[in-house]
């Protein structure tokens, strides 16, 4: 791939969008049942192993608006992958629970997902991946600071 003659910051900024678009197209063809954005919401919900997250918890972790995440959660609920339950400690609060159908989807795709990740990061050293994670976390912190200015 031939890169334009820009400084690294501008190249990286543009590459974020390009990779995001390519991953969305590839991801949407990966699953028959769900979109890649729906998959990401499921992954985020799954990280809350010990307790069910609220919509706000998921929206914050996804990095999207409450309204956008609610639309995705509603679609996943309609498809039977999620269930909305009341918080037993605060009946005003709704929590998101993965269903057995969702857990089956995860099991059915586990091997295919592992193969996808292996192919996606083929030829990339562990040290390089660690550096990318550090840079992404730093960028995330910078974005939060910029939002609060």
Identify the meaning behind each predicted range.
Residues 74-133:
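Charged, amphipathic alpha-helical coiled-coil/dimerization segments
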Residues 16, 42-45, 136:
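Hydrophobic structural patches
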Residues 1-32, 79-81:
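N-terminal leader segment of winged-helix/HTH proteins
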Residues 1-4, 127-149:
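C-terminal regulatory/oligomerization modules of transcriptional regulators
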